[in-house]
C-alpha cells in the first residue's frame, strides 16, 4: 500500500469514528503487552512446518506464501501426518440433468448478488478476530437462514447452523438432506483482511471473498427452487459452507473437515469458490474472459467433471491454472482426504491485485462474470446431488 493512501485515510477519518472502528476491530483475545507474542505452527508445503508469530504470518502472506495454520489440529492429534489418499469416487461420465439445470439457471440474479455484496462490504472489515467480524458473520447467517425459510426446504429438514471457533467469528453451514448421507459440499470464505494493518484499516473484501460468498448464496437460493431438492428427494445430501478465518491459514475449514473426519462423514466432493468477480485482468492481458480451473493439489476426477460442467452450463470457457499449496479452503478438505476442487475468476496471474487492501471494492467487479460462476456452482451441485457416487 502506498504511504499517501494511508495519510489520506488518517486525515479523512475523525478521531471519534476511527476510535470506534479500532475498538470493534481489535482482536478479541489480544495479548498483554508484556507477554511474548503467541506463536503458531504453519505448514507451507507437505511436511514443511515452522513456528511463527501473527505478524510473521502477515509478512509471509504479503510475500505471497500460502500456508495452513495447523496449531490446533496438530495439538489435538487430529491432523494426518501426510495427505491421505482420497477415497475413490466415480464421478459421472456424462451430464444427466441438463434440462433441469438450464431451467433453474435462468432464475439466477445478478441484482441479488450485487445487493448482497454491497451490504456485505459495508462492514469496515470481516477480520476473523474482531467484533465486526462477528457482526458480519451474523448478517450473513441471517441471509442464509432467510434463503432457506423462503423455500419449501424449511419444511423438509433443511437447516443452517453455526460452527463456532475460539477466535470469535463463526463458520456457517447450510444443509439440505438427501436420501443418503453421501454429501456434496460447496464452500467459500466469509472473512476479509487488510494485510497491512489488520486491526485498523478497512478490508471490504469484495472480491476476496465477498464475491464467492454471494455467488454460492445465490446458487443456494435457486437450487432450492427445485422441488425435488427442497423436498429431500435428491440422492445425496448437499451442504453450503461459509468459512471463517481463511486468511489466517485456512483455520475455519480445517476445523470443519477435521470434525468431519472424526465423525466419519462421507464427503464425496467439495468445490471452493474464492474470488469469482474480477475479469479485467484477463481482458487487459488480451485474453478471452474465462474461469480458472485449478489443477494443483486438487482431485483430478472431480476437476475433470467440473470441466464438463463449465462447458455445458457456462457461456465462457475454462482455462487451466495453478495457485500453489494451501491456497484456499478446498485444501483443507484435501488435507483430510476428501475429494476437492477449486475454480476461481481467471488464470491465477490475472486475478485481482487489489485483494487484502482498502481498494478491494464492488466497483471493480464484473457481475456478469460472477453469474457464470453461479451457473457453474448450480450445475455442479445439481448434477452431483442426483448422481450415484
UniProtKB/Swiss-Prot annotation:
Essential cofactor(s): Zn(2+)
Source species, domain of life: Eukaryota
InterPro entries hit by this protein: M28_fam (IPR045175), Peptidase_M28 (IPR007484)
Cofactor note text: Binds 2 Zn(2+) ions per subunit.
Entry GO terms, CC: extracellular region
Similarity section: Belongs to the peptidase M28 family. M28E subfamily.
Species of the source: Paracoccidioides lutzii (strain ATCC MYA-826 / Pb01)
Gene that produces this protein: LAP1
Alphabetically ordered keywords of this record: Aminopeptidase, Disulfide bond, Glycoprotein, Hydrolase, Metal-binding, Protease, Secreted, Signal, Zinc, Zymogen
Record-level GO BP terms: proteolysis
Protein name (record): Leucine aminopeptidase 1
Disulphide connectivity of cysteines: 323-327
Amino acid at each position: 500500500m502506498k504511504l499517501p493512501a494511508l495519510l489520506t485515510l488518517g486525515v479523512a477519518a475523525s478521531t471519534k469514528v476511527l476510535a470506534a472502528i479500532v475498538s470493534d476491530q481489535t482482536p478479541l483475545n489480544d495479548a498483554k503487552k508484556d507477554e511474548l507474542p503467541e506463536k503458531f505452527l504453519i505448514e507451507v508445503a507437505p511436511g514443511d512446518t515452522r513456528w511463527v508469530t501473527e505478524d510473521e504470518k502477515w509478512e509471509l502472506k504479503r510475500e505471497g506464501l500460502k500456508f495452513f495454520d495447523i496449531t490446533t489440529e496438530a495439538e489435538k492429534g487430529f491432523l494426518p501426518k501426510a495427505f491421505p489418499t482420497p477415497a475413490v469416487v466415480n464421478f459421472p461420465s456424462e451430464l444427466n440433468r441438463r434440462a433441469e439445470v438450464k431451467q433453474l439457471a435462468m432464475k439466477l440474479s445478478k441484482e441479488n448478488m450485487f445487493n448482497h455484496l454491497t451490504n456485505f462490504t459495508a462492514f469496515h472489515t470481516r477480520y476473523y478476530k474482531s467484533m465486526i467480524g462477528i457482526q458480519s458473520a451474523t448478517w450473513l447467517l441471517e441471509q442464509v437462514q432467510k434463503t432457506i425459510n423462503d423455500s419449501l426446504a424449511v419444511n423438509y429438514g433443511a437447516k443452517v447452523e453455526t460452527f463456532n471457533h475460539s477466535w470469535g467469528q463463526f463458520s456457517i453451514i447450510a444443509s439440505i438432506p438427501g436420501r443418503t448421507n453421501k454429501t456434496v459440499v460447496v464452500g467459500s470464505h466469509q472473512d476479509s483482511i487488510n494485510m497491512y494493518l489488520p486491526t485498523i484499516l478497512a478490508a471490504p473484501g469484495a472480491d476476496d471473498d465477498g464475491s464467492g460468498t454471494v455467488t454460492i448464496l445465490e446458487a443456494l437460493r435457486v437450487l432450492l427452487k427445485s422441488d425435488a431438492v427442497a423436498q429431500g428427494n435428491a440422492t445425496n445430501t448437499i451442504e453450503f459452507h461459509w468459512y471463517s478465518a481463511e486468511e489466517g491459514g485456512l483455520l475455519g475449514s480445517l476445523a470443519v473437515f477435521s470434525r468431519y473426519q472424526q465423525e466419519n462423514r462421507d464427503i464425496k466432493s467439495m468445490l471452493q469458490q474464492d474470488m469469482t468477480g474480477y475479469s479485467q485482468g484477463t481482458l487487459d492481458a488480451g485474453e478471452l474472459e474465462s474461469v480458472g480451473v485449478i489443477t494443483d493439489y486438487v482431485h483430478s476426477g472431480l476437476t475433470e467433471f467440473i470441466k464438463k460442467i463449465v462447458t455445458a452450463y457456462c457461456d465462457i470457457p475454462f482455462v487451466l491454472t495453478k495457485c500453489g499449496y494451501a491456497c484456499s479452503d478446498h485444501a483443507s478438505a484435501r488435507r483430510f482426504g476428501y475429494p476437492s476442487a477449486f475454480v476461481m475468476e481467471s488464470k491465477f496471474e490475472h486475478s485481482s491485485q487489489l485483494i487484502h487492501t482498502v481498494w478491494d471494492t464492488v466497483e471493480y467487479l464484473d457481475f456478469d462474470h460472477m453469474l457464470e460462476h453461479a451457473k457453474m456452482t448450480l450445475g455442479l451441485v445439481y448434477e452431483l446431488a442426483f448422481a450415484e457416487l
